[in-house]
Amino acid sequence: MKHFSVKACAKINLGLLITSRRDDGYHTLETIFAPIEWHDTLEFTESDKIGMECTNLDLPVDDTNLCIRAAKALQDYAGISKGVSMKLVKRVPFGAGLGGGSSDAAATLNALCRLWEIDVPSAVLHRLAVKLGADVPYFLEMKGLAYASGIGEELEDLSLALPWHVVTVFPEVQVPTAWAYKNFHRQFERPVPDLKALVRRLCDDRDLSVLDAFENDFGSVVFENYPVVSQVRDTLEASGAQFVSLSGSGSAVYALFENRALADETAEEMAGKFRVNVTPAGFRME
């Protein structure tokens, strides 16, 4: 009986600029995705049906779960009746803007191609991923920094890794994505900076002067309405970090540090109140 486990890493957004609202209600955006070491573990075992258990009992394991949906979508595409027993060891907070559920779904697609021994064209996997969630393709296809546009599904591999240590803090509150999109302050008419060029200057040249361009359009409304998220931001800004930002629509906040010892010290101080992760400089997903 085949059995193996895989990691499903989270992400942060370096800048998140919402550029328009489409007729179908979705918003277009530009962002830089960067992976962080904070990860879930998924275990896959051959079975005669699709089933799942999770270490976090607050997460449903029915057809609303992205891993179950990913497995059934792949099963339907391949026209097979094989099953899988999945166990999700959940570490990445949900409702945090870290893409944990999307990463789990992407890991499921990749793992089941291996477990079920099916050869699925990359274009088909991409389409299945987009149907599951706009940022699922990032976790499916990329290892390091990527530029994303459209609704987040149009990707360009930048072949870069962040040269800073990343401290990511979950303030123990969830920000509903739908609420964030309904309430953010629209700036559709503003000129959009060239995020790809700026992130190359940031990573290749260590040009810290470009950091102010990496705004997150959800930041102001989330900080205004969630005092604990604002508190986490203020603490990180006072710690000596080079840059502090909301990730996605929140609630997680991250900080970039040049000095690993300072990153570890800051994380240790905050770990008494919040869940915290430190990702080393140069990190890429496996």
From Swiss-Prot:
Disulfide bonds: none annotated. GO terms for biological process: isopentenyl diphosphate biosynthetic process, methylerythritol 4-phosphate pathway; terpenoid biosynthetic process. SUPFAM superfamilies: GHMP Kinase, C-terminal domain, Ribosomal protein S5 domain 2-like. Gene3D superfamilies: 3.30.230.10, GHMP kinase, C-terminal domain. The keyword Iron-sulfur does not apply. InterPro entries: GHMP_kinase_C_dom (IPR013750), GHMP_kinase_C_sf (IPR036554), GHMP_kinase_N_dom (IPR006204), IspE (IPR004424), Ribosomal_Su5_D2-typ_SF (IPR020568), Ribsml_uS5_D2-typ_fold_subgr (IPR014721). The keyword DNA repair does not apply. GO terms for molecular function: 4-(cytidine 5'-diphospho)-2-C-methyl-D-erythritol kinase activity; ATP binding. Keywords: ATP-binding, Isoprene biosynthesis, Kinase, Nucleotide-binding, Transferase. Pathway: Isoprenoid biosynthesis; isopentenyl diphosphate biosynthesis via DXP pathway; isopentenyl diphosphate from 1-deoxy-D-xylulose 5-phosphate: step 3/6. Its EC number is 2.7.1.148. The active site is at residues 11, 135. Pfam families: GHMP_kinases_C, GHMP_kinases_N. ATP binds at residues 93-103. It catalyses: 4-CDP-2-C-methyl-D-erythritol + ATP = 4-CDP-2-C-methyl-D-erythritol 2-phosphate + ADP + H(+). Belongs to the GHMP kinase family. IspE subfamily. Catalyzes the phosphorylation of the position 2 hydroxy group of 4-diphosphocytidyl-2C-methyl-D-erythritol. This is 4-diphosphocytidyl-2-C-methyl-D-erythritol kinase. It comes from Chlorobaculum parvum (strain DSM 263 / NCIMB 8327). The gene is ispE.
